[in-house]
Structures are given as structure tokens and as C-alpha cells.
């Protein structure tokens, strides 16, 4: 059961990473969702 859970988590992580790579580069704050900011062409979560 733990092996299946780990496999699913890894699959989700890979899917998210692939999705982030395919997203076009952002140019300003309005292109990112709430809680994120545009930095170096990518929407990154705001820390702090």
C-alpha cells in the first residue's frame, strides 16, 4: 500500500513539473494566479 502511495505521489509531481515547463513565460503579475508572482519568466509562490 505504501509503495502505491509513493508511486502516485511521484506521478503527480512529475505531471506538475511537466505542466510548469510547458507554460509560457509570464511577463507581469496579472498572468500568475493568486499567491504567486512572476519572476524570471515563471510564476513562483510568494514566500513569507
From Swiss-Prot:
- Compartments, record wording: Secreted
User: Keyword Disulfide bond: yes or no?
Assistant: yes
UniProt KW keywords = Amidation, Disulfide bond, Secreted, Signal
Propeptide residue interval(s): 22-27
The set of disulfide-linked cysteines is 26-38, 32-43
Q: What is its main location?
A: secreted
Q: In which tissues is it expressed?
A: Expressed in salivary glands. Highly expressed in the head, body and tail with a 2-3-fold higher expression in the head.
Modified-residue entries (Leucine amide), positions = 47
- What range does the record give for the signal peptide? 1-21
Q: Does the keyword Protein biosynthesis apply?
A: no
Q: Name one GO cellular component term.
A: extracellular region
Highest taxon of the lineage: Eukaryota
What family does this chain come from, according to its entry?
Belongs to the annelide toxin family.
Additional facts recorded: Does not show effect on voltage-gated calcium channels, potassium channels, and tetrodotoxin-sensitive sodium channels. Does not show activity on Nav1.7/SCN9A, and shows very weak activity on cation channel TRPA1.
Q: What does this protein do?
A: Leech salivary gland peptide with unknown function.
| Name listed for the protein in its UniProt record | Peptide HSTX-VIII
Which organism's genome codes for this protein?
Haemadipsa sylvestris
